[in-house]
Amino acid sequence: MAKLQLGYKASAEQFGPRELVEIAVAAEAAGMDSVAVSDHFQPWRVNGGHAPFSLAWMAAVGERTERVKIGTSVMTPTFRYNPAVIAQAFASMACMYPDRIFLGVGSGEALNEYATGFQGEWPEFKERFARLRESVRLMRELWSGEISNFDGDYYHTKDAVLFDIPERPVPVYIAAGGPVVAKYAGRAGDGMICTSGKGMDLYTEKLIPAAKEGAELGGRDFDALDKMIEIKISYDPDPELALENTRFWAPLSLTAEQKHSVNSSAEMERLADELPIEQVAKRWIVASDPDEAVAAVKQYTDAGLNHLVFHAPGHDQRRFLDNFQRDLEPRLRALG
């Protein structure tokens, strides 16, 4: 099994760019192995929402830190972005911060794409997944340093060359919510990304077996695949605060269909705020006892997930990081 790693989710929907950089620096000081940032053009909330540009943030964090891996969780390199330009951006960052940059990719949400000019009906999963696969092929072709004349169904290059490429290609992590994409992650990804709180059967019966099948079909070492999961955790010694902190992230409790098709932050916020706090909290590990919190996390390592990226919902992230370093990190390291 791949090495146990502990990471921090930098919530770009909740914090402005400067504050989020400083929090990432604090996360490294608290012992985190990685920091992963979301990439939204529009946040899920109008009130209190933010949407700093992930690539600018990553470069700033690279300059301010020394060892943490830095990446997206996740970016959609298929609609508002040209994948060739994303390949250039990540190649440049990987040159500046060797072996510290990774690219996490997903198939996209309408919220970010309509705001930046997408027109027509939001594509079905089949097209979005096809675009994603094609974009990954194109980016890897460019990272080879060879001349690219890519002629795909969606993307094209003509005599394109990246003149600054890292010694080793940028690792690509594939976000998987179901077995179809998990199989692709196993076959073609350097890592797989999923999120917690969706019932253990999803991980043990669908995602992990599908990723393993994909790796076997591709003749790859499944154990070498970095299996990342965003752990939604609201840990605080104050149980009332641990529960109430989840409120800001009520949009996570909407269905995938709602999140993928809603095209305005105001509508997303309206739908989310109609949910009772008990339903909102179901997506989270809500705990004030460290042993209870770690026992809940252990389910995921037992399932075979090795890279745990912790997403804390509260507005006081330094409080969470202090609590994490004191109460949770020693117990979590013992799992590996």
Swiss-Prot record:
Protein origin, superkingdom: Bacteria
Binding site for coenzyme F420-(gamma-Glu)n: D39, T76, S107, G108, N112, G177, G178, V180, V181
Active site per database record: H40 (proton donor), E109 (proton acceptor)
Signal peptide per UniProt: none
Family in the record: Belongs to the F420-dependent glucose-6-phosphate dehydrogenase family.
Subunit structure: Homodimer.
Chain's role: Catalyzes the coenzyme F420-dependent oxidation of glucose 6-phosphate (G6P) to 6-phosphogluconolactone.
Protein name stated in the entry: F420-dependent glucose-6-phosphate dehydrogenase
